[in-house]
Amino acid sequence: MAEDSHMQKQLEFQNGSLEEGFVVRSLENEPQNMMESLSPRKYSSSLKFKANGDYSGSYLTLSQPVSAKRSPSPMGTSVRSSPSLAKIQGSKQFCDGIDKNISMKPPISFLSSAASLGGYPLGKADLDHYTGRDSERSTRLSEKPPYSRYSSRNKSHDSVYFLGGLEGRKTSGSLLTMWNGNSLSCTGSSPISRSGAASMPSSPKQVRKMNLQDHSTLQPRLSRHKEPASENVSVRTRKYSGSSLSNMGAYSRSLPRLYKATDNQMSPLSLPPRSSLGNSRRGQLGEKDLPHSLVDSDNYLNFSSLSSGASPYKTCLSEGNPYVSSALSVPASPRVARKMLLASTSSDDFDRASYSGTSPSHSFISGEPDRVLVARRNFSCGSMELDDSDLESLRQSSETPQPVLRERKSSISSISGRDDLMDYHRRQREERLREQEMERLERQRLETILSLCAEYTKPEGRRLSAGTTVADVQKINKELEKLQLSDEESVFEDALVCPDARYRCHRKGSLQDVDVAGFGNLGHSASFLAPRGSRSDELLGDLTRTPPSSSAAFLKATNESSYLSILPKTPEDIGEEQRTQELAAMEDARMVILNNLEELEQKIKDINDQMDESSRELDMECALLDGEQKSETAELMKEKEILDHLNRKITELEKNIVGEKTKEKVKLDAEREKLERLQELYSEQKTQLDNCPESMREQLQQQLKRDADLLDVESKHFEDLEFQQLEHESRLDEEKENLTQQLLREVAEYQRNIVARKEKISALKKQASHIVQQAQREQDHFVKEKNNLIMMLQREKENLCNLEKKYSSLTGGKGFPINPNTLKEGYISVNEINESCGNSTNLSPSTQFPADADAAVTEPALAVPVSQPQSSEHFRSLEERKKQHKEGLYLSDTLPRKKTTPSLSPHFSSATMGRSTTPKAHLPLGQSNSCGSVLPHSLATMTKDSESRRMLRGYNHQQMSEGQRQKPEFYSRTASESNVYLNSFHYPDRSYKDQAYDTLSLDSSDSMETSISACSPDNISSASTSNIARIEEMERLLKQAHAEKTRLLESREREMEAKKRALEEEKRRREILEKRLQEETSQRQKLIEKEVKIREKQRAQARPLTRYLPVRKEDFDLRSHVETAGHNIDTCFHVSITEKTCRGYLIKMGGKIKTWKKRWFVFDRNKRTFSYYADKHEAKLKGVIYFQAIEEVYYDHLKNANKSPNPLLTFSVKTHDRIYYMVAPSPEAMRIWMDVIVTGAEGYTHFLL
């Protein structure tokens, strides 16, 4: 213990001498140190999810050795950091003294890359210093058994390891081999070497449970090896040692992998130094306290090693630097930290089970673990502001008992209701917004300070803007002070809401006056608790020179930096600067108004073009419809003419048939009159014959005979003529019916066509009227838009006039200077935003740099460099790769806008405070409701000037220096490689380079992408994030959509026509089927009527006594038929029968004159007639009966024949016109004639069932 006390006093003395040297050198190096300590801070957002990879230009070489006070803790030392290289060089002598005590230990080879602090490389003294500390480190490592947790998943995620001092454990591992150290087994070490990354529990309760187990396991080991640790441990001056990484296994495994620097990289980039509040607190702990490796300081990502103390078991030496250059950066937002905390699921349970199962006999005291999480809870609000009560608690913390382990409060896991969650989100969001604004203003101030320093290197004639820059810095300081005060109030308010969170771990150490420098180093470690590590470096750096008396003095010392005392400030200069700034702001506003005027005029021109195009389209469509309507009307007229012609043809057919019938009737009437005259003459002569004398009787008889023959001939001729006339009439009726039906079908078809054409003409008329109405509505809409744009144009002109008047009044009648270069038109793309963010990663979107700069007007000291073309190409390819994720977010962000390039950069002027100078008189043109329909028509004109804009940007790219080109390239590499990690969690790749932090994301409608789009009036210069490629892609998509719409309309029209044709065919087919069905129905009805007629007919006679029905076969043998019927033809000489004919005498009763006369009858199947002659010579034909007219042949059983010569031999032949009564000479002859005649009775259909 005495030796420990002596070592502590010697360390304090050394720290005092180092701080004196630091004060001397700080005035010379402060401007450069601040810029170089600021630049590593840029990596915090883009490196926190660094994926596994190895490349040059790595960013995690953080080996910064500093002197620190030794902690009496047996297994750990406190960490003291120094912001200057002077401390490191001054600590060489002290470390050399320590090396003498441990010279007996084997040396350790130094393989890590040279560390740097703020960009300064280390010299030989620093290497010696490293070697001494490494030797001391290996000495202590050789005396205790290391412990390493092993997990394959942890190993795949991290490269962070820690050693544990457990007895009987035969494993070895490197002490936090994150970058420089590779674990190697040395001579005599165990052949088994296991190492693994610590895992994080998935909940705070699990953390406490594991810490309890860790305490219970390690407490006996502490008491057992306390003496060797106090004897062998040496002073460590490593800033990022294992002691600054407490409880790594309990809190995260989602750390960026750390790799060894390449050989050709002599001075890699470094992150800003970080220490911990717990480190300063542990500097005052005694031996009774828990090792600082288990007492977490203040953050999610502080980890610790259990191998900080000494151990008698030596198993391995760490090759290279056994210390840690930590790249643990603060999560960009609490949401990301929450993801990291929840990343570990079950691996920690496995590790804890194996850990506790390995040595169950060792355990900690159960009351100790409550020290682990207290400090972390106190800083859940996201900022570390120290007031008097905090400092007092720090001084008295060594005597204060530790609080009992309690349930975690004021965290996201303790929120149960939706209202609480929304309130928590609102507070966190407001706090992060304040932090971003403070970071932006501080960065702006530091850039202005750097430009001030650059002004002193110029001649006196060039120092025109020094006063303006000083005024800028003053205004930025005021803004910073306001934001810091509001931030401090929010922190106090959160502490009042959660009183338990105010119980901090500051009580664990006393903060005396001599420890102010140590308190400043503590601020560097806790800088992640301040807003994104932006201002706490400067806050706590000022505390190393000025002890804080109160929170107000603390903020004032922070804001009023010593850099502002470089130039003198006078009221005249400030007034002139304000006037110059007002004039510059007015010139910028004039440029914006002129650009808006140009845009409005272009939009009015586009609307006029659209109106003309709409009018031309209307005329074209109306002309097309009119032509189609005319063609349909012409076809309709033709069909009507054809229909009239068909009707006339039907009428003429009827007239012709009636005329033919009339002619035949007239002819028949004439023949009838002639026959009647002959009959009258015959009757007169017959009367004269009865009255004439006997002498003239013979002559009169001869004359009467001649008249009788003539009467018979004429009667026969009249009957034939009458029959022919009847046949002709029936034939005419049949022809008339056929022709009429055909014509009627044609008439019906043409009528349907006429109806369809009338409907089509009506539809065309309706379509034409609808198109006219639609065109009228579009015209009214265009007129309304044009009027709105004209009103906006008038307002802009009025604003321009007012601005010119104001400028003239300020300048004494002078007008605005003419600068044609300020009227360049361009598109703000995502690449240009990325280029501007390459120089300032955490700038908010409202402070992005312009891509075009006027080199002739812009001052060289205030010129803002942009990214190099290679970085632009990389970002463009990156955007193409992520188009699927972002396409839905930027579809509304494709309007072109103007970019103004003022003579002085507006982003660092006091008039604008880094914001856009767009006037808020009206909404941006891209957001105007009246400009919504201009987008598709204006897309075609957007790509004309793309080549000239690329050349213009290429000219400005040549103005950048080599050092300024390396930073964006590095950011592009780190952002592109981080996409692998982000895509694995299914996050849309924001690249962490286009924006500061997405602090507006409780849901997607509140994210930065939607906030940066055109949703506020002052985003006209930064709202659009689309480049020329996206505009061309949008134009192509619009063309494809238009073509698809046209194709769909055409296909729909074709489908409608096909459906209409199908319906017409179906209708026609149905009509044909219906007509056929009607015909079938009518025929069936006729058949049914015939059957019913046979059944219902009151038959006046029975079935005729014939056994056969008519025979119509051509090869019919009449003779054989009669013989087959049973008749003996040879014995009946009254009848002569052949194969086709049958002849014989029969007595026939006359038709009109009921006289019985003997006639020679001939039945001829060849002629198909049954004719009778006067005698057997067949010279004088008396009458003809056609087979078609013969209906029935039957025996006269009713005795209807009047005055029949022999009623027993009388039979009847029934025809259509009359009934012929005949008397056969014998019964056999009667039966033969009846059977013969019935074979020709083709009109015999009543019994044809």
UniProtKB/Swiss-Prot annotation:
Residues carrying Phosphothreonine: T546, T570, T894
Biased composition (Polar residues): 74-84, 231-248, 901-919
Compositionally biased tracts (Basic and acidic residues): 128-143, 873-888
In-chain residues carrying the UniProt-annotated modification Phosphoserine: 71, 73, 156, 203, 241, 244, 329, 333, 347, 380, 383, 389, 411, 416, 465, 486, 510
Membrane-related topology note: Peripheral membrane protein
UniProt domain PH: residue ranges: 1139-1242
Known role: Seems to be involved in the assembly of the postsynaptic apparatus. May play a role in acetyl-choline receptor (AChR) aggregation in the postsynaptic membrane.
Origin species: Mus musculus
PANTHER family: PLECKSTRIN HOMOLOGY-LIKE DOMAIN FAMILY B MEMBER 2, PLECKSTRIN HOMOLOGY-LIKE DOMAIN, FAMILY B, MEMBER 3
Residue ranges that the Swiss-Prot or TrEMBL entry lists as coiled coil: 580-692, 718-803, 1028-1094
Domain remark from Swiss-Prot or TrEMBL: The PH domain mediates the binding to phosphoinositides.
Annotated protein name in UniProt: Pleckstrin homology-like domain family B member 2
Tissue spec: Expressed at postsynaptic membranes of skeletal neuromuscular junctions (at protein level).
GO CC entries: basal cortex; cell leading edge; cell projection; cytosol; focal adhesion; intermediate filament cytoskeleton; plasma membrane; podosome
Main location: cytoplasm
Segments of skewed composition (Low complexity): 267-283
